[in-house]
C-alpha cells in the first residue's frame, strides 16, 4: 500500500470516528417461509435491535399469505422490540379500497411508517392501475404516515430513460414521500452522481443508500441482472474461487460493504439502509465499523 493510499484510508477511518453517534441505520427483513427461517429472522432482529436502528422494514409479497405474514411480523416487531417497524406496501393486484383498509389497519395499530412501492408486474404483463406515487397520495389521505419510496441510481429496468426514472421519483416525493431508499449498488460513483441529479431536479429529501452485504456471489449475479445493477469486474475477481468457501465469502462481502460505507460517509451520507436477507452478522459488523454499537447507538 502506498503512503498516499495509507493516508487516504487513515483519513476515512478518522472521519468515521468523528461521526460516531451521528449515523442512522435501518434494516430490511423478509417474511420467513419455514420454522427454521423464522427462528433465524427473530434471532437477527433481536441482535440488530440492540443497535437502535432508525426503523426496520419488512417486505411484502404478491400473494395474500405473504402479505398476512408481513402484517403479523410488523406488529410483533413493534410489540417485542419497540422499534419503528415499517411494512412494505405494494399497489399491484390490490384495489384502492383494499389498500385503504390495509393502511387504516396499520394506522390504528400504531404503525406510522410505510415503504410505498408499485410492486412487480404480473407475468402476463399489462399496465398497472396504480403507481407508487398514487399509493403515496392514498396513504396521506388515510393518515400522516412517514413514507419511504424506492430510488434507482442505475435506473429501474422498466424505465424509458434515466431522466424518466428521475421524474417518476420526483412524482413520488411531490405526492408526500419523506425519503427515498435506493436499490443496492456497488459503484459508489453511480450513487453520488444520482444524488447530484436528484438535487438538480428539485428532489430535496434524503436519498438513503441501500447496502447489500454479499455472502452468495452467484445468487447476487442473477439478481443483479434482473434489477439492472452493475457488478464491477473487480468484485468478480475478489469472489473468484470462493464458491465452496462461505466463510471467506462473508469476510470479502463485509470488507466491500465497509469500504463503501466509509467512502459514502466521507461524502456526507449519514443514513444507511441494510438489506440483511434476514441475517445479522454482516450488517452488525458493518454497523460496528460505522460506530453504531449497542453502547453508543442513538
UniProtKB/Swiss-Prot annotation:
The keyword Acetylation does not apply. FAD binds at residues 60, 62, 88, 118-120, 132, 152, 156, 159, 165, 168, 172. Pathway: One-carbon metabolism; tetrahydrofolate interconversion; Amino-acid biosynthesis; L-methionine biosynthesis via de novo pathway. (6S)-5-methyl-5,6,7,8-tetrahydrofolate binds at residues 120, 183, 219, 279. It catalyses: (6S)-5-methyl-5,6,7,8-tetrahydrofolate + NAD(+) = (6R)-5,10-methylene-5,6,7,8-tetrahydrofolate + NADH + H(+). GO terms for cellular component: cytosol. NADH binds at residues 59, 183. The keyword Oxidoreductase applies. It is an enzyme of class 1 (oxidoreductase). One of its GO terms (biological process) is tetrahydrofolate interconversion. Its EC number is 1.5.1.54. Signal peptide: none annotated. Keywords: Amino-acid biosynthesis, FAD, Flavoprotein, Methionine biosynthesis, NAD, Oxidoreductase. GO terms for molecular function: FAD binding; methylenetetrahydrofolate reductase (NADH) activity. Its cofactor is FAD. InterPro entries: FAD-linked_oxidoreductase-like, Mehydrof_redctse-like, MTHF_reductase_bac. PANTHER family: METHYLENETETRAHYDROFOLATE REDUCTASE (PTHR45754), METHYLENETETRAHYDROFOLATE REDUCTASE (NADPH) (PTHR45754:SF3). Catalyzes the NADH-dependent reduction of 5,10-methylenetetrahydrofolate to 5-methyltetrahydrofolate. Is required to provide the methyl group necessary for methionine synthetase to convert homocysteine to methionine; the methyl group is given by 5-methyltetrahydrofolate. This is 5,10-methylenetetrahydrofolate reductase. It comes from Pectobacterium carotovorum subsp. carotovorum. The gene is metF.
